[in-house]
Amino acid sequence: MSSILPTLGKDVSIDIGSIQTRLMGGTRGTVISEPSIIATDTKQEKVVAVGDEAARLVLRMPDMWRPLTPLKDGFIVDYRVMHTMLNYFLNKVSNALRRARVLVGVPCGMTDVEQRAMMDAVIQAGAREVFLIERPVAAAIGCGAPIFEARGSMVIDIGGGTVDMGIVSLGGIVDSKTIRFGGSDINNALLRYVRECFGVIVSDEIIEDIKHTVGTAMAPLEDAEYAFQGRDMMNGLG
C-alpha cells in the first residue's frame, strides 16, 4: 500500500456500500476495495479483523467470529462499527489523508444526523475536509453525463443494499428517491429459487456469477442456460 501513497495527492473519494467499501485517489483509481464488515470474537466481543480478513475469518470459522456491518439498506445502523471500519480503511492511506480533502458518496435522503456521523468519522480518521455527494450525482459524473447542462439526466445506481435514483441537471439533483432494495436482495431471491427448485445449496460466489451471467433488465428477456454445482440438500453430497 505504501507504493501508492505518493500518487493519491490531496483528494480521496470513498464509496461506503452495504456490501463493499471502495477508496479512490489520484490517477490510480480504486486503491482499496474490501467488504464492509468487521469480525468480532464471539466470547469477548473484541474486534479482530476488518474487511477482507474479516470476511475470510467468518467464512472459515463462523462459530468463533461474528460478522458486524455498519450499514443496512445503505443507511448507518451501527456508528461504532462504522467508525472502526472507516478508521481501518483510512489509516491504510493515513499519510495521504493527513491533509486530504475527502469526498464521500452517500444515499439520497440521508438525515442530518447520519450525514454528521459520517463526516465526523472521516474527520477523526485524519481528513482535513469532508464533502458528501449523493450517489446519483457521483454516478452521473462517472459515466460522463452532462450534469451541468440545462437538461435532465436520469441516473439509477444499484448498490448492494439500496437503489438510488435521481434526475440530475445544472449540477444538482432535481428529484431523487432511494429504494431499500439492492443486489443482496436479488442474491437472496436467487438462493431461495435454487434451493426450492433444484434442492441444491450453492456458494455466494456461484449466486453472484448467476446474477451477472444470465440476469438482465433489458428487453427482450430470453431464456439462458447456466450449469452449476452445489450440495444436495437431502444427502449432503456435492
Identify what each model region corresponds to.
Residues 1-158, 166-238:
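Nucleotide/phosphate-binding catalytic cleft detector across ATP-hydrolyzing
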